[in-house]
Amino acid sequence: AQFLVSAIIPALWQIVIVVSTLLVLAANQRDHGLVRWLAPSPGVALCRTLLPYVPLFWLQGVAFLVWFYSGLQWPMQGNLWVLFAAQVPTILECMAMGSVFFFLTLDPARAMSFAGAFTAPSFAFMGITFPVSDMSPLAQAWRSLLPISHYIEAQVSQVSYGASALTTLMHLTPLLGYLLPALLCLLLARRHLNSAI
């Protein structure tokens, strides 16, 4: 249970974040319309819409870690606070990907299909049950695109090895690459807004 559940729950958590982001964006589009919702600044409007959900997703992440390592008293070699900190950029990148999927089409059903295809292999590609070095190049590339793959490396380094905070958080540096999807999301939102005006 400790080996599998500690990876399955974060994989499901990633899916929850991406899908919830899509649903929030779809609800705002439906209830307010693009112009009223995003004008005059799509970036500010998206931050105003999505940032209130970051603490909610973070509390979910905190809850499963506390459940694992305090409630079930699974062995923990490191510090939970390092993992709490590692969850914040993971959440932001999952939300960025959910936003990109939504603004690619403005169609919630199609965006949900993209999100499902993207996140479905999360558990298999994490490198927990199958070594990353033995994965095909395609699987390794897909794994590198999944935010939770980088978080799980941080979790393993802290839980199993008690690594320093800096070493653990260095596993998250690839998440800086998700600034590109965030930028793409803003460009797509602005393009849809300009088309709607």
Predicted region positions:
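Transmembrane helix-boundary elements of multi-pass transport/secretion proteins
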Residues: 1-62, 68, 78-79, 167-168, ...
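Membrane-spanning alpha-helical segments of multipass transporters and channels
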Residues: 55, 66-67, 74-197
